[in-house]
Amino acid sequence: MTYMHNLGDGGFEWDASNVTHIARHGLQTGDVEHALTNDPVTVHYAVTDSGEPRWVSVGPTSTGRLLMVVWTVRGARVRVVTAYPAARRLQAAYAKAKGGRDGASKTDPPVQD
Protein backbone atom coordinates (compact mmCIF):
# COMPACT_ATOMS: atom_id res chain seq x y z
CA MET A 1 0.00 0.00 0.00
CA THR A 2 1.33 3.45 -0.84
CA TYR A 3 0.26 6.83 0.45
CA MET A 4 0.30 10.22 -1.19
CA HIS A 5 1.18 13.52 0.40
CA ASN A 6 1.92 16.78 -1.35
CA LEU A 7 5.23 18.13 -0.06
CA GLY A 8 4.12 21.64 -0.96
CA ASP A 9 6.52 24.44 -1.73
CA GLY A 10 7.61 25.47 1.75
CA GLY A 11 10.97 23.76 1.45
CA PHE A 12 12.73 21.77 4.13
CA GLU A 13 13.32 22.53 7.79
CA TRP A 14 16.84 21.61 8.92
CA ASP A 15 18.65 22.30 12.17
CA ALA A 16 21.90 21.10 13.71
CA SER A 17 20.16 18.14 15.34
CA ASN A 18 18.68 16.52 12.26
CA VAL A 19 21.68 17.40 10.08
CA THR A 20 23.96 15.66 12.60
CA HIS A 21 21.56 12.72 12.83
CA ILE A 22 21.49 11.99 9.09
CA ALA A 23 25.26 12.51 8.89
CA ARG A 24 25.64 9.50 11.21
CA HIS A 25 24.09 7.49 8.38
CA GLY A 26 26.53 8.95 5.84
CA LEU A 27 24.01 11.37 4.35
CA GLN A 28 23.83 15.07 3.61
CA THR A 29 20.74 17.27 3.40
CA GLY A 30 20.90 17.34 -0.41
CA ASP A 31 20.75 13.53 -0.55
CA VAL A 32 17.59 13.45 1.53
CA GLU A 33 15.91 16.37 -0.22
CA HIS A 34 16.55 14.74 -3.59
CA ALA A 35 15.14 11.43 -2.37
CA LEU A 36 11.91 13.13 -1.28
CA THR A 37 11.50 15.25 -4.40
CA ASN A 38 12.55 12.74 -7.06
CA ASP A 39 9.51 10.48 -7.43
CA PRO A 40 9.56 8.76 -4.01
CA VAL A 41 7.19 6.01 -2.93
CA THR A 42 5.54 6.66 0.40
CA VAL A 43 5.08 3.29 2.06
CA HIS A 44 3.75 4.13 5.51
CA TYR A 45 1.75 6.77 7.32
CA ALA A 46 1.08 6.99 11.04
CA VAL A 47 0.21 9.54 13.69
CA THR A 48 2.45 9.72 16.75
CA ASP A 49 1.12 9.73 20.31
CA SER A 50 1.56 13.51 20.29
CA GLY A 51 -0.67 13.75 17.21
CA GLU A 52 2.07 14.52 14.67
CA PRO A 53 1.63 12.78 11.31
CA ARG A 54 4.66 10.86 10.03
CA TRP A 55 5.34 9.47 6.61
CA VAL A 56 7.93 6.89 5.55
CA SER A 57 9.09 7.32 1.97
CA VAL A 58 11.66 5.59 -0.20
CA GLY A 59 13.33 7.55 -2.97
CA PRO A 60 16.55 7.80 -4.94
CA THR A 61 19.39 10.25 -4.41
CA SER A 62 20.93 12.00 -7.41
CA THR A 63 23.32 9.04 -7.68
CA GLY A 64 20.49 6.46 -7.59
CA ARG A 65 21.06 5.28 -4.02
CA LEU A 66 17.71 4.49 -2.40
CA LEU A 67 17.00 6.12 0.95
CA MET A 68 14.34 5.49 3.54
CA VAL A 69 13.15 8.82 4.96
CA VAL A 70 10.84 9.39 7.93
CA TRP A 71 9.36 12.87 7.74
CA THR A 72 6.56 15.16 8.86
CA VAL A 73 5.17 18.54 7.88
CA ARG A 74 5.48 21.50 10.23
CA GLY A 75 3.76 24.57 8.92
CA ALA A 76 4.54 24.56 5.21
CA ARG A 77 7.93 22.85 5.59
CA VAL A 78 9.06 19.26 5.47
CA ARG A 79 10.90 18.23 8.64
CA VAL A 80 13.06 15.13 8.25
CA VAL A 81 13.00 12.95 11.36
CA THR A 82 15.57 10.45 10.12
CA ALA A 83 16.96 9.01 6.91
CA TYR A 84 19.25 6.15 6.01
CA PRO A 85 20.02 3.76 3.14
CA ALA A 86 16.94 1.67 2.39
CA ALA A 87 17.00 -1.97 3.49
CA ARG A 88 16.57 -4.62 0.79
CA ARG A 89 12.92 -5.09 1.70
CA LEU A 90 12.22 -1.39 1.08
CA GLN A 91 14.29 -1.42 -2.10
CA ALA A 92 12.11 -4.29 -3.33
CA ALA A 93 8.92 -2.43 -2.36
CA TYR A 94 10.15 0.64 -4.24
CA ALA A 95 10.99 -1.38 -7.35
CA LYS A 96 7.62 -3.14 -7.26
CA ALA A 97 5.76 0.16 -6.90
CA LYS A 98 7.68 1.55 -9.86
CA GLY A 99 6.74 -1.35 -12.09
CA GLY A 100 9.65 -3.74 -12.01
CA ARG A 101 12.89 -4.87 -10.51
CA ASP A 102 14.89 -1.92 -11.83
CA GLY A 103 12.47 0.69 -10.53
CA ALA A 104 11.57 1.91 -14.02
CA SER A 105 8.02 3.17 -13.71
CA LYS A 106 5.30 2.83 -16.25
CA THR A 107 2.63 4.09 -13.86
CA ASP A 108 2.47 4.62 -10.15
CA PRO A 109 0.27 2.27 -8.13
CA PRO A 110 -3.03 3.45 -6.67
CA VAL A 111 -2.59 5.64 -3.63
CA GLN A 112 -4.59 6.09 -0.46
CA ASP A 113 -4.76 9.11 1.80
Describe the role of every protein-language-model region.
Residues 1-113:
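Ribonuclease/tRNase effector modules and their secretory precursors
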